[in-house]
Amino acid sequence: MPELPEVETTKRGIHPWIHQKKIIEIIIRDKRLRWPIPDDMREKLINREIISVQRRAKYLLIETANGSAIIHLGMSGSLRIIEHDEPPRKHDHYDFVLNNGIALRYRDPRRFGSLLWAKEPLKHKLLSKLGPEPLEEEFTGTYLHSKAKSRKITIKQFIMNAYVVVGVGNIYASESLFLSGINPKRMASRVSKKRMTALVKAIKIILKKAIDAGGTTLRDFHNRDGSEGYCKNKLNAFDKKNKPCPNSNSAIRLIVIGQRSHTTA
């Protein structure tokens, strides 16, 4: 499943190709995604100039003067820049055809992604109550510590909650907890402010490295040009069961937290 670094990588990849370009056609081959593509999507977007491409959590916002297309990649979705007349393949669900001869094509074998529309996207019900971005200044140890008070869940479950902070999925939660030396099974309310500050620092480091590396190659994720991300070989703990811990001589163990697997030394 594409996580924040993968979505950020996609945003950075497509932006130079579609920024300030006009959408001259939208080709919808199959509108049956997680939610059906709205019938008026073509009316909303055709002949509109793309003024920016933004990311909020794991959503991409294709902004025009009168509103934004909200794209979620779901579990297996990807966006590619192609020549406008490139024949579609299986699972290619829609194209945004632009006035520079290229198209932005969405592919999604599992169809858990979505394409929605909002006049003010940050007020949309899917985005309005989300937590802060992990790489922004407002995400601090003090903030995280205050949110954790009286929470009776593990620290790993806590930081994976998008209403606490967005974009810290299973892989990056595992890596951040490993880097900060915090037991993933520890109750969130029992983590001190000092250790929360260390955890926030680790989250920022891990996510920045993943973005710089182009995302994590896990099953379905590809960059905007179809090439695979290449961060997986840089992970310290995730998916490293029984392999030596880089910080000690002990083997990395697999445990289950909240129905998700977690690897730890």
Regions found by a protein language model. Give the residues of each.
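A cross-family signal for N-terminal binding/gating loops and helix N-caps
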Residues: 1-113, 238-247, 260-265
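Phosphate/anion-contacting hairpin/loop surfaces
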Residues: 65, 69-167, 172-179, 187
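Glycine-centered secondary-structure boundary/capping sites
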Residues: 20, 47, 129-132, 181
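Basic, nucleic-acid-binding surfaces and adjacent catalytic neighborhoods in DNA/RNA-processing proteins
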Residues: 22-40, 54, 70, 145-265
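Generic detection of long, well-ordered alpha-helical segments
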Residues: 1-4, 134, 138, 192-200
